[in-house]
């Protein structure tokens, strides 16, 4: 038994070392994205919640994990790469259908803390794409759909490094949505994900965006299906060859379950 434990620890350490080596020479921001993308590409949420899924052995050796194991994995990788990283834990809320506490991370970049929830982003990514709805959020944004904290963590007050803002995927005008989506259709890309920052994402605004996207798609003989993360005002415009029964569907980042058809 002791020999088996020792072998397991050696294999785990070897895995961590290999991952850390691949990030050598990266800037802190690149390291954070590298860790996030590793989770989103290699870890599946364990709906059975096996014991090892709560520890780093789940994500790093079994390729599965729950939020606790994922947050611990993000932390150990960030620690080894020289990035300051903490784990945040929120309360459960049984009355709202949230049966368990939830864990995610805070990462420090240039003396400023940001929220990073790789579990939630992982629950949104489909057909090989990666989502960044929970990458470098400030307190105002993260607590739109995260429960109050079990214990205090540093304040996150900077919203300017939110992934979609920093990568010019945060749009404020309907004409910008039209222009970007037409470019996606021209390039025959399968989808376009963006953050809406042009005021409240009301039903009226959403219907206007749907109209713009549908018209642009029809011109190319295509259809569009829109998935909306209302909490973070992020939407995905997916190009399809067939008309969906439900053009607009709600998607909610959570513990590995995607809602909507």
Regions found by a protein language model. Give the residues of each.
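Secondary-structure boundary elements
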Residues: 4-59
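Short, charged, solvent-exposed linker or helix-capping segments at domain edges/interfaces
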Residues: 5-8, 117, 249
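Hydrophobic (often cysteine-bearing) scaffold residues that line and stabilize catalytic clefts
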Residues: 12, 31, 66, 70, ...
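A short, highly charged nucleic-acid-interacting micro-segment common to nuclease
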Residues: 56-70
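Hydrophobic/aromatic-rich core segments of domains that either
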Residues: 69-141
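Low-complexity, Gly/Ser/Thr/Pro-rich intrinsically disordered linker/tail segments
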Residues: 129-260
